[in-house]
Amino acid sequence: MKEKVIVIGGGLAGSEAAWRLANEGHRVILYEMRPKKMTPAHKTGNLAELVCSNTLGGLELTTGAGLLKAEMQKLGSLVIEAAKVARVPAGGALGVDRKIFSEYITEKIESHPNITLIREEVKEIPEDEVVVIATGPLTSDALSEKIKELVGYDTLYFYDAIAPIVEAESVDFSKGFWGSRYGKGGDDYFNCVLTEEEYKKFYEELLKAEKVKPKDFEKAVHFEGCLPIEEMAERGYKTLLFGPMKPVGLVDPRTGKEPFAVVQLRKENKEGTLLSLVGFQTKLTYKEQKRVFRLIPCLRNAVFVRLGSMHRNTFIQSNKVLTHYLNLKKKENIFFAGQITGVEGYVASSATGILAGINAGRLARGEKPLKAPTETMLGALVNYIVTKEGELQPMNPVFGLLPPLEKKVRDKKKRKELMAKRALETMEKWIKENNLVPEGLVKVC
């Protein structure tokens, strides 16, 4: 039996971390507070309970989630194994029977000889042990306080405010100009220009658009200083013109005049292939976001890789406190995994659990932790959350995070196919070089 590792949280990420560590021969103590103490969203005491959708996203390798799932399978993912056992028809997506899925994972964890499952709320972090914290978006108040003390009070967030992100190549750059306010900061922003007539149409449709109904446990959340754009619009016709759409300090070089209104797009990655809509956090439904935001002239044909949202979500500013290994910069024996790291979605959460498990095990054995290659979707996603400049908001796996191909490929589908091929080949090489798949860990269902 190898060294002990503690995992706090029995969701998707915690289950993956525990499974990985146990199969490497470590003695794992897994803490899960349910069913003794429930969250407002969970209904059972099962491990890896899915509280939102019952699909794990698309299977196509040309989608971010599909590619990440393929990488996870190569790493011996328990979540992918369970999803295949519990699979239900869901078109091109990997849909599962929630009950079968969570019961399968619970049984696997409970019956593993190297895992001790303790059903208790953790109120203190054992800072002298190797620990993986994977407590998710609804981390208990007591543990949240301890995490705050550990990472710093300004680096633990309790809600997210996600603005949409579009593919740069889908933006019509003839409908605006690059530049910063008052000429400061260079060409950091692309300014989508709206005439008064275009603004009026956008404003009216924004007010009419359907919103997502908040869950009961989210109703008390106040987004101080970070209002949804539709709520700002409800305060009056000109409110947005003094907020995220203000034209002050910007001169359109095509006219020599200040535009009536602008929507600023900011680069989300170094390559500039992804652009976010600045200040456009929203609670509109996904369908309505696409309809309304495409009324902005430069976004008429926009391809959205992430849509906006605002909801209750406990997560850390990983870019300030974590390394590429998913451990704390200041305390290398403490790892984080799952949604609490600032990744979005079931698959991304699960994948970070695998990586945290790999590196917690290596550290416990006195070995050097490993950085996942950025050519893989797992490596690219982790690289994003730990290196993002400014404020981190949750991110899902998208192709725009991957480094470009050495040779430029114009056809978008072909480009994604080649990126996926490179990612899987890189993952296989990384696994082989570092002996990352213990015998019997990968099961074909």
Curated annotation (Swiss-Prot):
Its EC number is 2.1.1.74. It is an enzyme of class 2 (transferase). It is found in: Cytoplasm. InterPro entries: FAD/NAD-bd_sf, MnmG-rel, MnmG-rel_CS, MnmG_N, TrmFO. It catalyses: uridine(54) in tRNA + (6R)-5,10-methylene-5,6,7,8-tetrahydrofolate + NADH + H(+) = 5-methyluridine(54) in tRNA + (6S)-5,6,7,8-tetrahydrofolate + NAD(+); uridine(54) in tRNA + (6R)-5,10-methylene-5,6,7,8-tetrahydrofolate + NADPH + H(+) = 5-methyluridine(54) in tRNA + (6S)-5,6,7,8-tetrahydrofolate + NADP(+). PROSITE patterns: GIDA_2. Its cofactor is FAD. GO terms for molecular function: flavin adenine dinucleotide binding; tRNA (uracil(54)-C5)-methyltransferase activity, 5,10-methylenetetrahydrofolate-dependent. Pfam families: GIDA. FAD binds at G9, G10, G11, L12, A13, G14. Its main location: cytoplasm. One of its GO terms (cellular component) is cytosol. One of its GO terms (biological process) is tRNA wobble uridine modification. It comes from the Bacteria. Keywords: Cytoplasm, FAD, Flavoprotein, Methyltransferase, NAD, NADP, Transferase, tRNA processing. PANTHER family: GLUCOSE INHIBITED DIVISION PROTEIN A, METHYLENETETRAHYDROFOLATE--TRNA-(URACIL-5-)-METHYLTRANSFERASE TRMFO. NCBIfam families: gid_trmFO, PRK05335.1. Belongs to the MnmG family. TrmFO subfamily. Catalyzes the folate-dependent formation of 5-methyl-uridine at position 54 (M-5-U54) in all tRNAs. This is Methylenetetrahydrofolate--tRNA-(uracil-5-)-methyltransferase TrmFO. It comes from Aquifex aeolicus (strain VF5).
